Amino acid sequence: MMNISNVSIALYLCTLFAFVSSDSPEAMRDLVTNFPGQPKVSFRHYAGYVTVNIISGRALFYWFFEAMTHPNVKPLVLWLNGGPGCSSVGYGATQEIGPFLVDNKGNSLKFNPYAWNKEANILFLESPAGVGFSYSNTSSDYRKLGDDFTARDSYTFLQKWFLRFPAYKEKDFFIAGESYAGKYVPELAEVIYDKNKDNENLSLHINLKGILLGNPLTSYAEDWTGWVDYAWNHAVVSDETYRVIKQSCNFSSDTTWDVKDCKEGVDEILKQYKEIDQFSLYTPICMHHSSKVDSYANYKTTIPRLFDGFDPCLDDYAKVFYNRADVQKALHATDGVHLKNWTICNDDILNHWNWTDSKRSVLPIYKKLIAGGFRVWVYSGDTDGRVPVLSTRYCINKLELPIKTAWRPWYHETQVSGWFQEYEGLTFATFRGAGHDVPSFKPSESLAFFSAFLNGVPPPLSR
């Protein structure tokens, strides 16, 4: 019989093996060292490329952060931003949930005390090709981009990433994201779910447990209806404009944009939103260089598209930082000499390359995942005008799920953080006073909510 000392040694060796087994030669080549401006931390992080198509030379860029403590026992979470065309490195990692936030000059980094890798191992992926550092050597690939293309490439990425980091293959796996990732996340989850049913190739199995969606684009008709209703309800547009839209627009129809009154009414909302930050109605806009202030023409050309976006000042700081030679070299994005022109959102994906497919609704996928027993949580910052809380509530109501627990406030540090409701198979919560990118506005509350999600328990429902 083993004594206490031997048991301790055995446990230590098991833990050590868990770390060592994650360090494949490829993984060690991706280990980030001497990252410019990085605060001193005890966890490791890795960055680099995973080739998803050898023939076309298509590769996706990732940045992976071990959990701050006990990475060998904590789950793995993939974070995706939307767009289509926006970077999970520039937004999720840099402005929201990553451990290193870019300062207000783009010169250095500051530690994020509310980083989500306090609770999990976090993997950021720039997808599809053409986003951030991700690329293809075959230019025709860029004209094939769409939801299905992105889901397939993301799945291939995961399979190859797990070969590089085998210690994470069997961990509980979750997918999280916001805005247009409201499409990406369930679509990728569906691919994983379907592929996992292939009992003849168990080596491809991914231990998917659930999805987490923030201010997500979900269903075309409900998203647009909620967008219009929210703008009127928050006094952004006149009663007359609202009346015209309600009378002339049928967002369930493919031809609604051919109706002159409908298009002009929607244009009027966009015109008014030009004056403020649509993604956060009650915060100031950045005046020195605001892509939002100058984006009215882009909105008009991308109707009926809905796309991601955040505080343009933060976007600018990220652009400065990730175009530095020393930063690109440290992240293994380039050799530090032949630099890439990194942008936080690639407008070409919508404006020039087109987007070949976008599901009108992912609610059928919600139903499929719920029936499969996966955890589905949705949250919404209630001051976001782009993918507003009304849109999300309309979408959830469309599912007609039985209510499990009554609508009630949830709390963080004795204050009301938002409201919360559990349905059979789905959990919905709001964040009071948060805009589109909720963790940027409510970092402490978001971390607490994320922890509750991982544990499958409600956030605090009393002070």
Curated annotation (Swiss-Prot):
Tissue specificity note: Expressed in flowers.
Locations listed in the record: Secreted
UniProt-listed Pfam families: Peptidase_S10
Signal peptide: 1-22
Keywords: Carboxypeptidase, Disulfide bond, Glycoprotein, Hydrolase, Protease, Secreted, Signal
Record bears the keyword Secreted: yes
Gene Ontology CC: extracellular region
GO molecular function, one term: serine-type carboxypeptidase activity
GO BP terms, alphabetized: proteolysis
Broad class of enzyme this protein falls into: hydrolase
Domain of life: Eukaryota
Active site: residue positions: 179, 384, 436
Disulfide feature: 86-345, 249-262, 286-313
EC numbers: 3.4.16.-
SUPFAM superfamilies, per database record: alpha/beta-Hydrolases
Glycosylated residue positions: 137, 201, 250, 341, 354
Function, in words: Probable carboxypeptidase.
Similarity remark: Belongs to the peptidase S10 family.
Protein name: Serine carboxypeptidase-like 32
Organism of derivation: Arabidopsis thaliana
Gene: SCPL32
